[in-house]
């Protein structure tokens, strides 16, 4: 009898190689265990509002930050003028500013109903009367101030610049020192490092040396400081006129056209001119 058996010959020859063009044998499937279905990869949520990439589908917005200083009518006037000018707006409302807004207007700004609350806020005049203005808030996107992973926290996020109206001394200090305790301060720091326009409408009186040094630091970093102090040469007859003047100066610093106040031409107060 030959010492070579069929099993030994197969073991020595190694695994059988399939010729080119020969169909592969199907993998046997146990009738007792069905094949495991392939699970689709979960979608990663977008960081952008409305589940879109703002840089690809929308024009670059102005970021408007509202801090806790008194002067929420200034912010409302700036927001209205930006929307009238056809600008897209990204809105960041700090926690402290919600308390100020509630105290000055009686409006509670809620994350879940921010669009309705914003519409009511912008419709109110500086004298507190509701339904003074009609405003379309659809071009506004709202970002929670606690979301440090939001779009405006990155330099790659498209933005024309940022307007902080009103700016509290705490907000001024945080931005001047490069802190990022919330999205408002982080967005301002990003705007500065990207060499975009930052307008800070500080609303405080009196100003001590520490705050003045912070304002100088912001100016040195490239920001424009606009004190929330109205002028009276434009013939103001209503509190809204005074608010609009400050809002207009903020927009002037940002380069946004508006018609909020009557500009000085040398004759507004009846003064004489040399002929």
What are the residue ranges of the model-derived segments?
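Compositionally biased, low-complexity flexible segments
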Residues: 4-46
């Amino acid at each position: 009898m030959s010492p070579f058996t069929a099993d030994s010959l197969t073991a020595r020859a190694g695994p059988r190689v399939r010729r080119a063009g020969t169909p592969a044998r199907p993998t046997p499937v146990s009738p007792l265990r069905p094949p495991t279905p392939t699970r689709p990869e979960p979608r990663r949520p977008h960081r952008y509002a409305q589940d879109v990439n703002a840089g690809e589908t929308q024009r670059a917005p102005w970021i408007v930050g509202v801090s806790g200083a008194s002067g929420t009518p200034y912010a409302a006037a700036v927001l209205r003028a930006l929307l009238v000018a056809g600008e897209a707006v990204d809105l960041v409302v700090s926690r402290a500013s919600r308390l100020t807004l509630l105290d000055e207007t009686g409006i509670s700004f809620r994350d879940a109903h921010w669009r309705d609350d914003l519409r009511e806020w912008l419709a109110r005049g500086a004298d507190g009367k509701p339904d003074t203005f009609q405003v379309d808030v659809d071009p506004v996107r709202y970002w929670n101030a606690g979301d440090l992973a939001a779009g405006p926290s990155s330099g790659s996020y498209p933005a024309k610049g940022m307007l902080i109206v009103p700016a509290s001394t705490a907000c001024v200090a945080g931005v001047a020192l490069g802190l990022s305790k919330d999205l408002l301060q982080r967005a301002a720091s990003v705007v500065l490092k990207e060499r975009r326009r930052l307008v800070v409408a500080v609303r405080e009186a009196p100003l001590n040396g520490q705050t003045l040094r912070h304002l100088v630091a912001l100016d040195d970093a490239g920001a424009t400081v606009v004190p929330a102090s109205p002028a009276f040469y434009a013939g103001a007859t209503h509190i809204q006129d005074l608010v609009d003047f400050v809002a207009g100066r903020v927009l002037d610093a940002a380069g946004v056209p508006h018609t909020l106040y009557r500009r000085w031409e040398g004759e507004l107060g009846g003064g004489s001119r040399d002929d």
